[in-house]
């Protein structure tokens, strides 16, 4: 895979340039564009993934299905599709917007900062997973209600962006509705 970049944003969310992805994620991470996706199977179960230990930020942490950064000229939806293929080896239904204005800043235990405008999407797959071990070290298909209960009970076990997304009542309602419509 070619070198990925992030799209830098000003405080109003307007693109101002690009920076190589790994150079962008430091203790002083600039605001940039990302996306987050929750992937469901035909049973309405959510794919929860555990980030590979080689990941720069939040290694070994459980998170929603796929996250990443759109490339210059690429739509968020196309970026979700690209990363699902790359990380999980699956084809998905067209991603649906769940939480379009999600924005967060969080610092991992190693001091790496995420500072992102990060629209949230949901999609479905019926494909068998072909996990990329460089991205994902473990995964589980779970009922959404069980995942949300786990996040509420033990937020420290999940990525901060997943916890913050699940804390939004409208996003939670839309994810629940999405899971139920197989």
Swiss-Prot record:
Record key words, sorted: Cytoplasm, Isomerase, Isoprene biosynthesis, Magnesium, Manganese, Metal-binding
Record-linked Pfam families: NUDIX
Cellular localisation: Cytoplasm
GO molecular function, one term: metal ion binding
Keyword hit for Zinc: no
Positions bound to Mn(2+): 25, 32, 69, 114, 116
Binding annotation for Mg(2+): 67, 87
Catalysis performed (reactions): isopentenyl diphosphate = dimethylallyl diphosphate
The protein's enzyme class: isomerase
Record InterPro entries: Idi_bact, IsopentenylPP_isomerase_typ1, NUDIX_hydrolase-like_dom_sf, NUDIX_hydrolase_dom
GO biological process: dimethylallyl diphosphate biosynthetic process; isoprenoid biosynthetic process
GO cellular component, one term: cytoplasm
Protein's pathway: Isoprenoid biosynthesis; dimethylallyl diphosphate biosynthesis; dimethylallyl diphosphate from isopentenyl diphosphate: step 1/1
Cofactor(s) for this UniProt protein: Mg(2+); Mn(2+)
The enzyme's E.C. designation: 5.3.3.2
Function: Catalyzes the 1,3-allylic rearrangement of the homoallylic substrate isopentenyl (IPP) to its highly electrophilic allylic isomer, dimethylallyl diphosphate (DMAPP).
HAMAP family from the UniProt entry: Idi
NCBIfam families linked to this entry: IPP_isom_1, PRK03759.1
Subunit description: Homodimer.
Family, as annotated: Belongs to the IPP isomerase type 1 family.
Protein name according to UniProt: Isopentenyl-diphosphate Delta-isomerase
Record organism: Shigella boydii serotype 4 (strain Sb227)
Gene behind the chain: idi
């Amino acid at each position: 895979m070619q070198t990925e970049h992030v799209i830098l944003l000003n405080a109003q969310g307007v693109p101002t340039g690009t920076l190589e992805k790994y150079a962008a994620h430091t203790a002083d991470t600039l605001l940039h564009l990302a996306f987050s996706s929750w992937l469901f199977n035909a049973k309405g179960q959510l794919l929860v993934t555990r980030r590979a230990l080689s990941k720069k930020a939040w290694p070994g942490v459980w998170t929603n299905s796929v996250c990443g950064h759109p490339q210059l000229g690429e739509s968020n939806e196309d970026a979700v599709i690209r990363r699902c293929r790359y990380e999980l080896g699956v084809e998905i239904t067209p991603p649906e917007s769940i939480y379009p204005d999600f924005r967060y800043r969080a610092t991992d235990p190693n001091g790496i900062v995420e500072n992102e405008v990060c629209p949230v999407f949901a999609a479905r797959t019926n494909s068998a997973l072909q996990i990329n071990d460089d991205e994902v070290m473990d995964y589980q298909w779970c009922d959404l209600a069980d995942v949300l209960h786990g996040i509420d009970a033990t937020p420290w076990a999940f990525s901060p962006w997943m916890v913050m997304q699940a804390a939004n009542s409208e996003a939670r309602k839309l994810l629940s509705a999405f899971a139920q419509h197989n």
